[in-house]
Amino acid sequence: GSGRTRQQISLHSNNVMDVQWLTGRSFEHVAHPNQALADALFATCSADATVHLCKLGEPKPIKTFARHTDEVNAIRFDPSQTLLASASDDANVHIWPLNLSGLATSTTSVAPNDTEPLHILRGHTQEVYALAWNNTGPGSSHPDKPRMLATASFDHTARIWNADTGACLHVIQGHEMSVFTLCFSPCARYLATGGIDHRVLITRVSDAHTVYSYTGGGSIMDLAWTQTPRTQLAVAQSDKQLVVLDLSTSLH
């Protein structure tokens, strides 16, 4: 296209903190009976403590999730595109069910208190800043394994949760300051976490054992695994450096 503005809408009463397209993820593609509808859906979250599910072209949200009590920092759809996780300054993570089939014939805005979370994940003691779904469960490359969600918090920990039951599987306690970012490896076996303490920890998902650590020259702002067979992790740092770690021989 021409790069022109397709739509501009006022959805929130405070800063918009994150936005995610339903089908704009790196997981294995999931086909919907109404793919055109799925491609038009996106979610937003805000410092106004709400999460909106929106459809391109609609002037108002088609669904609002309003159970958090403080800023919502991050949102992520699961691999099956049937769940939405939200992380908040209220120290909780909510997992919301998505009934996309019910949206196929209706674009009517739903009342804010219409939907209860499937699970409220409690355990963090400070703000939860980042989320990541593992490549497990329905719609993933490992459908026989339970859905897993990782969360990063200013309480210096990350947690791995069973998203099917809401149970906390592991608490990762190796950081000395706020955990700012995290991501699972494509093979689903490892979780990388990055903190304000300049450290990257790579944890084995099965037992929460730290299998590799790296200390950079600044706070760790973002992490990204390669999607290629060679195991590499890109690390964005606050000291203006980008580091690529070759972990091919470090992870077993």
Predicted regions mapped to residue ranges:
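WD40/WD-repeat beta-propeller blade-loop signature
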Residues: T5, N15, A38, P61, ...
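Short coil/turn linkers that define WD40 beta-propeller blade boundaries
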Residues: G3-R4, P59, S101, T115, ...
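Loop/turn segments within WD40 beta-propeller blades
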Residues: Q20-D39, R76-T82, A132-P146, C183-A188, ...
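WD40-repeat beta-propellers
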Residues: G1, V51-C54, I75, V93-L98, ...
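Short loop/turn segments immediately following beta-strands, especially the blade-tip
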Residues: P97-S109, L247-H252
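WD40/WD-repeat beta-propeller blade N-cap
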Residues: S10-V16, A66-V72, D114, L121-V128, ...
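Blade-level signature of beta-propeller repeat domains, shared across WD40, Kelch, NHL, RCC1
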Residues: M221-H252
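Conserved strand-to-loop turn within each blade of WD40 beta-propeller repeats
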Residues: C45-D48, S86-D90, T151-D155, T193-D197, ...
